[in-house]
């Protein structure tokens, strides 16, 4: 491999590591805010305990997300200096807005939320977590706006004297139709991820506590159907508490899943228009077809169109996804390659067909894990029931990673499907604003890039291990006893000596 390949591997590995954490942060912040809102409205201590419990998990994820995200912006100057030189005037604007507006908003009010328990009025403290939720989603918008400019550049001109793109209209960049389509799709995926995370943990805790109570025989024999009515439990029972969180999450999962399908369809149709090569590669559609099918299973060497064989396919579905018409004509990879050679000169304009094809299907298929948990969860918790079936505990745990993997697959598809472009040409925009990966990479010795690849991969692996260890530890630990009742301050000491300031959440 040359320096270009290693640089791409490094950027891909660090981005996927970081993007595992991002959707959970985006979706979990408003869910924690909703839990705290329920506590403020109802006054039930169970919602307070849920807020503190899932708030702790949110803080762990947020901290590791910041740690892995800091390196991302430095990547552009490290291995992609030519890219930075070419688009710096444009790309820097949304990144600056993300840092100066969104990140400062979420960081400031997150600090107030952490230290504001028992110190701020209830409604003021509640407002801080909602502002955190707004901040993390605003941060996502600015990042997606920057990435969408790479997918579909608008609001810029090409300066022939400097040989780079220059921003002329920040509003056009922020209202780029690519960004407006991608943002709600990404947010829906984030809500699905967070809701599955909360539902999975809550489902596991419900079954764990129900089986524990059953074994200890503290409440007598359970009914024959293996569930305990919620009404039979005290209000502070952890089973009842986690059932409330699970039911809320199941509903969020269904709504987010529907939003994913709708926004995904909108974004897909836009990509057929703006990046037809990406969508043709997603289907391994080698030649132009009328009434193009959508394949569920394809075999062959996917980077060689001559060997691709579609074994199981749904007739006309790709055409429908492209233009809402089962008989529409969809351009194939070979024809688009010829078109791009005429328009942009000699070169290979085909992305990696194997990666784009399977990443697209993984993105869609893995969402089934969340759907299965939502449907099963609503059924086993119906009518106030609290499940103790072991299969539901396993389903809850196994469903948790599926939306994380689906989000990563979607991100890989989005980026790999754009190759070889790092700034894809806007076919109706400024012709000179385009850049391929080999034009954007830094001129570093391959050994230096390999060293940084190994270093960052090991560092991120260590951070990933810390992330998993902390989440696992505090999930198993569960809600703490001192969180059973809100706003309980420690007794005042008669000792007048000043104490060292400490923090514990």
Predicted feature locations:
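Polytopic transmembrane helical bundles with strong interfacial aromatic enrichment
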Residues: 1-505
